[in-house]
Amino acid sequence: MKIVVIGSSNIDMIARVNHLPMPGETVGQARFMQAYGGKGANQAVAAARMGGEVTFVTALGNDMYANMLKEHYCKEGIVTDQIIIDNQNPTGTALILVAENAENCIAVAPGANGSLSTAHIEQISKTLEDAD
């Protein structure tokens, strides 16, 4: 099945903390990890893992995170030839705090995600027509 996913792509910067900080509070002893994220990216990866032939349409910055994400998508078997590189904005980033009780706070810096436009979508009309 040919699937086209159009959506966001982020690098998630995650800090696991004992509790979410109050305004002005610093919480120490955080455990940090970095992950691949974005609503569109998560859908593309899930569809590829289920056996779909997935083309992912997103916008990334011209930075090290873009290279990491494209490599990740390729390893997942996702077609990346429709990914747009935005030289004006960085790759999207999500800053996530997760408390021990699983509550979280998320701040998203959309970066290049905001540069994906209807003009880009019109340029891939053939890809969309060929999808199931």
Residue map of PLM features:
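Glycine-rich phosphate/adenosyl-contacting loop at the front of the ribokinase-like
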Residues: M1-A59, M64-M68
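Conserved N-terminal subdomain of the carbohydrate kinase-like
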Residues: T26, R49-A131
